[in-house]
Regions:
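Catalytic-core regions of core metabolic enzymes
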Residues: 1-253
């Protein structure tokens, strides 16, 4: 209270242990190696690849620049001229990265199979876990990831757009989105797929050279600090931008 009036301050105080900001050395090298494999993918499987216009079908089409692309669908013989496989074990080589565009129970089963087959890193774009009251399903994914040392980006996110390799899991038709055509030293990390896509389209409009874009969604498989460390170690990326709503944990170890 002052002679000329008063001031009101609105603040929230969180009591407990002081916040310790994560450092690069706190983060697991094994997890970072798995994350790096996603952006160095030589072979990619799309689990749930399907008809044109479906989520899996759009991801398959958008990633067609990749040299080795494997659609996984037990009900199809071919998609986009590529032979389909009933499951990941049927693929004739070890797949580096798998994208899961199937419901939670199928994702859990497929992710376990992927890890057992020597997979290196995954992306889970589907939802239906803790955000709708099924933390048990999310815990199953995390347990598989921890047991095998394989990380996944997601769940419930748009995944990645990598201009260096052509890996693109955005499940939006290209006619609806203007994406950067030039690869370059800028990386973008976003929790929100919508905000992240808006940033990507703004970059395209300004002709900015975007190298890597990531939508982490619920970030149950990999943390934003880990993605920052990954981009910091990537010689191709010199500037990283991030849009986030909040952190559940500071970092994973």
């Amino acid at each position: 209270v002052y002679p000329e009036g008063f001031s009101i301050v609105d603040a929230r105080m969180i009591l407990g242990e002081p916040i310790r900001h994560p450092r690069a050395e706190d983060l697991s090298e094994k997890r970072l190696a798995s994350l790096k494999a996603i952006f160095d993918a030589k072979s990619v499987a799309v689990v749930g690849a399907s008809r044109p216009g479906s989520i899996g079908g759009i991801i398959l089409k958008n990633s067609s620049r990749l040299e080795k692309l494997y659609p996984i669908n037990p009900k199809r013989d071919k998609l986009m001229g590529l032979p389909c496989y009933p499951n990941l074990r049927a693929v004739p080589e070890s797949v580096d990265v798998a994208v899961f565009a199937v419901p939670p129970h199928d994702t859990i089963r497929g992710f376990k199979e992927f890890c057992e087959c020597g997979g290196k890193g995954a992306l889970i774009v589907s939802d239906g876990y803790a955000e709708i009251g099924r933390p048990d399903l999310e815990d199953q994914l995390k347990a598989i990831a921890d047991r095998h040392g394989v990380v996944y980006i997601g769940h419930n996110g748009l995944g990645v757009f990598d201009n260096f390799t052509g890996f693109n899991t955005l499940f939006l038709p290209m006619i609806r989105s203007q994406l950067p055509s030039r690869s370059g030293p800028i990386g973008i990390i976003s929790q929100s797929g919508g905000i992240g896509l808006e940033l990507l389209e703004m970059a395209a409009e300004d002709n900015l050279p975007i190298g890597t874009w990531v939508s982490v969604g619920n970030a149950s498989g990999i943390s934003i600090p880990e993605l920052f460390v990954h981009m910091g170690r990537d010689d191709r990326i010199r500037s990283s931008r991030c849009a986030w709503r909040g952190f559940a944990t500071a970092c994973s170890s």
